[in-house]
């Protein structure tokens, strides 16, 4: 999987950037996504997280991770519903699945609050957001159990334990 990473803060260590790419590629394999799958991750501060949270969720506070799922039917591209694309073309298309915005301030706060490493927290936030982009949620106890169980399974298998 290709992950475009942007550090708007200029403060994220290169090891965290590489780990984020690796853990997301690992999670993509776990979900059997195509190797050509693409997404982006932007590291932001709390002020930018607050702006984005207000813009996309109408919530007036910063948050740890914002997940924006790409929905082809809401894109600028137009495909006629009756149009059939050749199978070869469909296989070649690189599916962009969405973007994450991770607050570095919240990551540091939460790592301290939960008593685990900053590496674990960045991994947790990346995988959590990734699962949201791929249709997982935690509105009900059943959904929460499924999503958090899969999230923990991915992080543990990758090596980011508590």
Curated annotation (Swiss-Prot):
Signal peptide: none annotated. It comes from the Bacteria. Gene3D superfamilies: Metalloproteases ('zincins'), catalytic domain (3.40.390.30). Keywords: Cytoplasm, Endonuclease, Hydrolase, Metal-binding, Nuclease, Ribosome biogenesis, rRNA processing, Zinc. Pfam families: YbeY. Its EC number is 3.1.-.-. Its cofactor is Zn(2+). One of its GO terms (molecular function) is RNA endonuclease activity. Binds 1 zinc ion. Its main location: cytoplasm. It is found in: Cytoplasm. GO terms for biological process: rRNA processing. One of its GO terms (cellular component) is cytoplasm. Belongs to the endoribonuclease YbeY family. NCBIfam families: rRNA maturation RNase YbeY (TIGR00043). This is Endoribonuclease YbeY. It comes from Lactococcus lactis subsp. lactis (strain IL1403). The lineage of its organism: Bacteria, Bacillati, Bacillota, Bacilli, Lactobacillales. The gene is ybeY.
